[in-house]
Every structure is written in structure tokens, then in C-alpha cells.
């Protein structure tokens, strides 16, 4: 049974369609990276899953329970971290956490233990007596995570948790999320920091204009986005002749000679090849073609496609 599921989920604001028949499945223990341009529908989706917003049509489920009909049973299962933390700034950290623990009906010594545990998990124990308004942005975001962990939810819904954080705070947040994943939490996280999502998440969804363009593993999205290869080919000499040979191979879109700094302090030249192996031979055949034609290879590498590149290839940058 999926831990998070949406079925033809739609949200309208008057004439504006923020979500358009969104179908999403996230299994227990998954860390799902939700990617899309501003205005794509990420926050709307997360707010519906957090039971804070009613869908116009369609269905959303948490652990098999239907949002809108079983919210009372759903809320103990989820922890929602918005992109901006609303804090009672005149409280100290322990008061803040104890206040929310009481709201979850955690009382007495159990409350104190739970507060100590989440402070330790989020590495905020040394700030237990500090006022909330004295915390840095990164610490406040970790405090927001500590707050939603008080009742030990199965599902974490996180809307841009690293937004506005400096590099050190982002690293600390990433390590915290890795630990939560090791604990078996199901995590849905939206973020614009795509390299970190690629490292953290095992599943990714790309949304644009309220529609899900892709839903699958990071490896699958990289394969799907890789409509062509970018190859760096080095030969000892006869660059133009090698380039002309490659240009005649079916599937080669473009060949150019570019400068290459090999890292040894000497500037050389390489062939920059755009190649689509769906239209011709496999990319692994190209070295043999060159060698059999009398060229000596000094380099044959493929430019990696990362999550940022995949995102740019699969989206058009459109918003509602």
C-alpha cells in the first residue's frame, strides 16, 4: 500500500488550475523529491496532503486514509514543515517544543523525554535555553523539523526546508534528512537545490503547470532526459579529419573542435560531439570506428547528465 497517493487530484482557484489531475504514488520509506518551477503546484500539493487545503476534485490518501474524510486519523501520521517557520519568538527553544508536545497530548516526564530526544536528533541540545528569535535561519529550520518530530510521524511533508540557508546550514539540514530516511520515515520534499535532491532522494517527480511530467527514480529521470550524448574525444593529430569522419556517422548531430585544459598545464584540443545513438550505432562503437580508421585516441569520455540538466530538458519554464 502506498504511503502517499493522489488520484486525479485537481485544485482550482477560480479560472486558475493549480493542479490538473495529479497522479502520484510514494511508497513507505521513500524520499521523494518534488521538483518544479515557481507556481508549478508543489506547495498546493503539499498543503492538500497536510490537510490544510481542500482539493477541488480527485482524491489524496495518506497510509490508505482519505484526505477530507479521515483528517482526524491522518494528522497524527504527518509532520508538515512549511517554507517559512511561524515561531513564538519570545519563547525559549524548550518552551516552544513543550508547547507543541502538549498539543499532541504528550504529558509529564514523557514530554520532557521527547523534547530531549528531538533536540538531540536535530543537534539543537546546546540551544535548549536560547530564545527562538535569537536562532539563525538554519537553526530555526532545524527547530521546525524538531517540532514535527515530537509525535513521531510516519510521513514528513517538507516545503523548501533549505530555502534561504547558507551552505553550512544546508549541509546540516541534508544530513538530518538522511538520518530521518534511515529511520524509515517517508519524506516528500520540494526544493530548488537539485544536486542535493539527487543525493538525498531515491524517487523524483517533476511538475509543471499543475501536471506531473515525470515520476520515477533519479536514474530513470536521467535516462529519460538523455535524448543525446555529449562526448569529448581526443586524438593525437588530424583533428579535422577525425571530426569529418565522426560527422558522417548516423546519429551524430554536431562535431566541433574546442580547447581542452587537461589539467597538466598544457592547453590542447578535443572534439566535442553531440550524438544520439537512437538514430545510429551505439556510443560504444565510436572508439573502434576511429581506431580502425587509423586514429590514436587520447580521450573518450561522456559528459554526465545531472538532475539540473534533466530538469531543464524536461521542462519549459512555464507557470500558471
Spans of features found by a protein language model:
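ABC transporter nucleotide-binding domains
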Residues: 2-6, 11-209, 213-214
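ABC transporter nucleotide-binding domain
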Residues: 174-275
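Solvent-exposed beta-strand sheet faces enriched in polar/charged residues
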Residues: 7, 234, 258, 301-303
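Non-catalytic surface loops within mature trypsin-like serine protease
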Residues: 28, 126, 235-237, 275-277, ...
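Alpha-helix N-cap/helix-start and coil->helix boundary motif
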Residues: 10, 94, 194, 219, ...
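A short, local hydrophobic-aromatic micro-motif
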Residues: 7, 56, 253-256, 298
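C-terminal coupling/interaction segments
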Residues: 274-320
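Conserved protein kinase catalytic domain
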Residues: 75, 119, 222, 287, ...
Amino acid at each position: 500500500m502506498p504511503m502517499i497517493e493522489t488520484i486525479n487530484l485537481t485544485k482550482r482557484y477560480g479560472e486558475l488550475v493549480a493542479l490538473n489531475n495529479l497522479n502520484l504514488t510514494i511508497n513507505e520509506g521513500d524520499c521523494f523529491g518534488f521538483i518544479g518551477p515557481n507556481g508549478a503546484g508543489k506547495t498546493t500539493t503539499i498543503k492538500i496532503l497536510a490537510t490544510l487545503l481542500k482539493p477541488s476534485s480527485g482524491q489524496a490518501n495518506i497510509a490508505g486514509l482519505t484526505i477530507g474524510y479521515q483528517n482526524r486519523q491522518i494528522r497524527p501520521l504527518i509532520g508538515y514543515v512549511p517554507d517559512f517557520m511561524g515561531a513564538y519568538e519570545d519563547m525559549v527553544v524548550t518552551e516552544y517544543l513543550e508547547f507543541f508536545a502538549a498539543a499532541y497530548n504528550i504529558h509529564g516526564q514523557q514530554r520532557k523525554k521527547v523534547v530531549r530526544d528531538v533536540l538531540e536528533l536535530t543537534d539543537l541540545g546546546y540551544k535548549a535555553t536560547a530564545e527562538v528569535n535569537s536562532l539563525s535561519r538554519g537553526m530555526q529550520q532545524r527547530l521546525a523539523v524538531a517540532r514535527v518530530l515530537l509525535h513521531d510521524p510516519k510521513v514528513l511533508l517538507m516545503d523548501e526546508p533549505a530555502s534561504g540557508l547558507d551552505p553550512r546550514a544546508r549541509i546540516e539540514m541534508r544530513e538530518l534528512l538522511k538520518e530521518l530516511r534511515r529511520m524509515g520515515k517517508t519524506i516528500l520534499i520540494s526544493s530548488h537545490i537539485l544536486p542535493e535532491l539527487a543525493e538525498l532522494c531515491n524517487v523524483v517527480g517533476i511538475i509543471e503547470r499543475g501536471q506531473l511530467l515525470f515520476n520515477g527514480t533519479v536514474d530513470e529521470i536521467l535516462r529519460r532526459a538523455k535524448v543525446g550524448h555529449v562526448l569529448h574525444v581526443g586524438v593525437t593529430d588530424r583533428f579535422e579529419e577525425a571530426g569529418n569522419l565522426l560527422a558522417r556517422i548516423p546519429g551524430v548531430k554536431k562535431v566541433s573542435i574546442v580547447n581542452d585544459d587537461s589539467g597538466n598545464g598544457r592547453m590542447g584540443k578535443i572534439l566535442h560531439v553531440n550524438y544520439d545513438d537512437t538514430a545510429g550505432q551505439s556510443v560504444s562503437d565510436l572508439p573502434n570506428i576511429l581506431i580502425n580508421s587509423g586514429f590514436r585516441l587520447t580521450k573518450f569520455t561522456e559528459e554526465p547528465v545531472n538532475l539540473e540538466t534533466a530538469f531543464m530538458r524536461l521542462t519549459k519554464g512555464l507557470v500558471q
